[in-house]
């Protein structure tokens, strides 16, 4: 299969622990033995820290977006280092470059692309561009919930939903540079348009990627 994985920054780069990158690299190496893998990595806490400081310095939203993109590309380079020779050596700057890099036979790792697009949207657009068979979105919780489980103890996990239900849910969420949400509105719209099966899993356990690829009941499945 051709698989695009959105690795949430909150799942891998919080605290910038080298072991987390190694753990993800080990799982990705296993998947790459049988599948074509493209990774989009978010900015995580480091991006939000830089963005918060930039806000205090008076930076506008476009500048904040560029800062987030820059940090996500640094995170991509860290994962490339952890993957070693199986990784394409440079994070692509756009979807066309990523598509071309894919034909090298290497694992492609990239960050953000343009202002106004979160890495959720980048992953969804990339999946559509390369005709992926599966999109996996990792996050810091066990899937999509009826509310933020960190704030609402009554929130329940949704085992499966349609792309339209995802769109309806996320359009109520305000998106800002560095925002940490389950999915962004543009990404959700692309998932709906492309009809690519999508699974949202807890990224704190990298092995969940393998379970999602195997079709095991994990996280939230988004499909028609």
Swiss-Prot record:
Assembly information from the UniProt record: Homohexamer.
EC number: 2.7.4.22
Residues noted as binding ATP in the record, renumbered to the chain: 9-10, 44, 48, 139, 145, 148
GO terms of biological process kind: 'de novo' CTP biosynthetic process; UDP biosynthetic process
PANTHER family: URIDYLATE KINASE, URIDYLATE KINASE PUMPKIN, CHLOROPLASTIC
EC supergroup of this enzyme: transferase
Annotated UMP binding sites: 43, 65, 113-119
Recorded superkingdom: Archaea
UniProt gene name: pyrH
Pathway as given in its UniProt record: Pyrimidine metabolism; CTP biosynthesis via de novo pathway; UDP from UMP (UMPK route): step 1/1
Localization terms from the record: Cytoplasm
Activity regulation text: Inhibited by UTP.
Record's catalysed reaction(s): UMP + ATP = UDP + ADP
Listed GO MF terms: ATP binding; UMP kinase activity
InterPro entries recorded: AceGlu_kinase-like_sf (IPR036393), Asp/Glu/Uridylate_kinase (IPR001048), Uridylate_kinase (IPR011817), Uridylate_kinase_arch/spir (IPR011818)
Protein family: Belongs to the UMP kinase family.
Keywords of the record: ATP-binding, Cytoplasm, Kinase, Nucleotide-binding, Pyrimidine biosynthesis, Transferase
Protein name: Uridylate kinase
GO cellular component terms, A-Z: cytoplasm
Species this protein is from: Methanocella arvoryzae (strain DSM 22066 / NBRC 105507 / MRE50)
Coiled-coil blocks: none
Function description: Catalyzes the reversible phosphorylation of UMP to UDP.
